[in-house]
């Protein structure tokens, strides 16, 4: 007797949910051995937040020290170690790897791929980052303490004569190891985007976030090998007497050129992905397609190209760079960034806006990053830069740009994609409390630092005189820093509570208006992401899947990648026929 196969229409792929859990303690084994991009993305993100909180505690210690002159509960040496490791952790152990956290979580889903191109290399990249970060931070437990020469490690301050001890060596070694993980992660993301897009997913149908990760990964391959080589040279100087960075040979300026040729593309390496996150979120809460898709892509490419031509604006005060060229290029890079602002505002214009927590953080990003960008244009002028270089004006600018971009957009992304990754919703009331504490605390901390810099307070000083007149501003800044620190408590509680007890998501798209493919699969997705893929005929496949009655109107309005006009009304494109249904 033979069994008769059921009719084709009755077949349905069903996910066995929930997953089998295994014995107690199995989670640790799964974390160590996993190659699932979603789990690796969560591991990246959780690890980055751990580093973020450690770096934030260091900042609170420094702000407490600066609240009043003569306080000195930290020694000068401890203060130097804190600002060095604060900058290192925030930039290289939080901001850069959290890019790969979001890329792992979202990018394969957005292009319809079952995983990244090299899953084991992906896991290897994470472990390199983790152990590299631990090596760099372990300087605090060795005799002599951690690295204390600033996160920029200017020579000769960072050589063996001026900064002896294991802390500097651990810092160099840790950044080499973590940087290798970043380089391998970039190779993986480029290969994934180029080789693993779903049928119908042309380059100009990719989500903007995917575009930005692709461009960021290319920038990483340009910038990070230079940092790695420069660090190897510094290690050779410290241990082999290589004299690469000897002042007599022009080595001091050589280090600055090498470091900043990495350092300025690095600013955009940690900005572009978060521009992408903002570009994914705003259309969903404006109930509109993204305005100016093509110009956003070209603006991203322009920023990437210009980012490798402006590094010496960090070196205006050396008197050894061509001021007009680097000043002009720095002004120029504001143009594509302004285009992005124009598109974000255009997306919201006349939209049906609602202000859930992800959208609130997007608005916070827009305001904060705009102010930071304006002070950046001011610093692009050499006469102004000469006045405020190495003062708290630069510190304020730097934090407005980077906190405004990275932290606000990180929180926006966490609140936006948390339901997709966990199958549960975060608490909106706690989310709004978190936003307002973060927004108020940040601006209270850093707005007054512009005035401190204009008054002449130098950065990296552990104390100042009562007669300097800096104390009122420093008190305000310290109060803001503690508000900012307090804002993390509702966030951590929200994540913990919601992950275990939050409202369960029963639909593919809990926000209702998602555009890209991650909103066309379950929450959380199955191991290989999709049981079936919708047709990809525009840059909004999930929206068209959920609102098929809108497709004809969208075609008539001629969105990106579509032929339009009366003559094309009945034309069926070849790639529409070939995509799987």
From Swiss-Prot:
It is found in: Cell membrane. Pathway: Energy metabolism; oxidative phosphorylation. Its EC number is 7.1.1.9. Binds 1 copper B ion per subunit. Binds 2 heme groups per subunit. Heme a3 binds at residue 397. Cu cation binds at residues 264, 268, 313-314. The keyword Cell membrane applies. It comes from the Bacteria. It is a multi-pass membrane protein. Its cofactor is Cu(2+); heme. The chain crosses the membrane at residues 40-60, 89-109, 123-143, 170-190, 213-233, 258-278, 290-310, 315-335, 359-379, 398-418, 433-453, 476-496. InterPro entries: Cyt_c_oxase-like_su1_dom, Cyt_c_oxase-like_su1_sf, Cyt_C_Oxase_1, Cyt_c_Oxase_su1_BS, Cyt_c_oxidase_su1_bac. Coiled coil: none annotated. It is an enzyme of class 7 (translocase). There is a cross-link at residues 264-268 (1'-histidyl-3'-tyrosine (His-Tyr)). It catalyses: 4 Fe(II)-[cytochrome c] + O2 + 8 H(+)(in) = 4 Fe(III)-[cytochrome c] + 2 H2O + 4 H(+)(out). Keywords: Cell membrane, Copper, Electron transport, Heme, Iron, Membrane, Metal-binding, Respiratory chain, Translocase, Transmembrane, Transmembrane helix, Transport. One of its GO terms (biological process) is electron transport coupled proton transport. Fe(II)-heme a binds at residues 86, 399. GO terms for molecular function: cytochrome-c oxidase activity; heme binding; metal ion binding. One of its GO terms (cellular component) is plasma membrane. Belongs to the heme-copper respiratory oxidase family. Cytochrome c oxidase is the component of the respiratory chain that catalyzes the reduction of oxygen to water. Subunits 1-3 form the functional core of the enzyme complex. CO I is the catalytic subunit of the enzyme. Electrons originating in cytochrome c are transferred via the copper A center of subunit 2 and heme A of subunit 1 to the bimetallic center formed by heme A3 and copper B. NCBIfam families: CtaD_CoxA. Associates with subunits II, III and IV to form cytochrome c oxidase. This is Probable cytochrome c oxidase subunit 1.
């Amino acid at each position: 007797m033979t069994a008769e196969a059921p009719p084709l229409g009755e077949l349905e792929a069903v996910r066995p949910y929930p997953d089998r859990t295994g014995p107690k303690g199995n989670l640790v084994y799964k974390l160590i051995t996993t190659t699932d991009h979603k789990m690796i993305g969560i591991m990246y993100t959780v690890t980055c937040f751990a580093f973020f909180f450690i770096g934030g505690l260091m900042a609170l210690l420094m702000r407490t020290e600066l609240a009043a002159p003569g306080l000195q509960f930290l020694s000068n040496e401890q203060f130097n170690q804190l600002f060095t490791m604060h900058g290192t952790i925030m930039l290289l152990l939080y901001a850069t790897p959290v890019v790969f956290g979001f890329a792992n979580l979202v990018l394969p889903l957005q292009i319809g791929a079952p995983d990244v191109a090299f899953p084991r290399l992906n896991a290897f990249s994470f472990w390199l980052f983790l152990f590299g970060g631990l090596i760099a931070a372990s300087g605090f437990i060795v005799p002599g303490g951690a690295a204390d020469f600033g996160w920029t490690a200017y020579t000769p301050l960072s050589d063996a004569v001026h900064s002896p001890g294991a802390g500097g060596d651990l810092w160099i070694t840790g950044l080499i190891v973590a940087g290798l993980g970043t380089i391998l992660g970039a190779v993986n993301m480029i290969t994934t985007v180029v080789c693993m897009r779903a049928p119908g997913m042309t380059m100009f149908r990719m989500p903007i976030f995917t575009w930005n990760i692709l461009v960021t990964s290319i920038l990483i391959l340009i910038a990070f090998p230079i940092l790695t080589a420069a660090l190897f040279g510094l290690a050779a100087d410290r241990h082999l007497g290589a004299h690469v960075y000897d002042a007599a040979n022009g080595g001091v300026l050589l280090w600055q050129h090498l470091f900043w040729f990495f350092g300025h593309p690095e600013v955009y390496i940690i900005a572009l992905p978060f521009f992408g996150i903002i570009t994914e979120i705003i259309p969903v809460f404006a109930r509109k397609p993204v305005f100016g898709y093509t110009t956003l892509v070209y603006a991203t490419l322009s920023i990437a190209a210009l980012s490798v031509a402006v590094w010496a604006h960090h070196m205006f005060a050396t008197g050894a760079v061509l001021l007009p060229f680097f000043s002009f290029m720095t002004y120029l890079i504001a143009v594509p960034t302004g285009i992005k602002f124009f598109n974000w505002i255009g997306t919201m214009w006349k939209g049906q806006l609602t202000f859930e927590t992800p959208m609130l953080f997007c608005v916070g990003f827009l305001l904060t990053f705009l102010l930071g960008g304006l002070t950046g244009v001011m610093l692009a002028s050499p006469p102004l830069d000469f006045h405020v270089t190495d003062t708290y004006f630069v510190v304020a600018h730097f934090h407005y740009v980077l906190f405004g971009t990275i932290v606000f957009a990180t929180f926006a992304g966490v609140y936006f994609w948390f339901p997709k990754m966990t199958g549960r919703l975060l608490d909106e009331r706690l989310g709004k409390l978190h936003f307002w504490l973060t927004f108020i605390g940040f601006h209270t901390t850093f707005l007054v630092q512009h005035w401190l810099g204009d008054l002449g307070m130098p950065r990296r000083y552990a104390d100042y005189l009562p007669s300097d007149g800096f104390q009122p501003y420093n008190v305000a800044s310290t109060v803001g820093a503690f508000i900012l620190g307090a804002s993390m408590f509702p966030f951590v509680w929200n994540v913990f509570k919601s992950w275990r007890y939050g409202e369960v998501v029963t639909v593919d798209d809990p926000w209702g208006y998602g555009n890209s493919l991650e909103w066309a699969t379950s929450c959380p997705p199955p191991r290989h992401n999709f049981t079936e893929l919708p047709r990809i005929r525009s840059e909004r496949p999930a929206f068209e899947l959920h609102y098929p009655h809108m497709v004809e109107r969208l075609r008539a309005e001629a969105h990106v990648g579509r032929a339009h006009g009366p003559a094309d009304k009945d034309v069926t494109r070849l790639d529409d026929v070939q995509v799987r249904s």
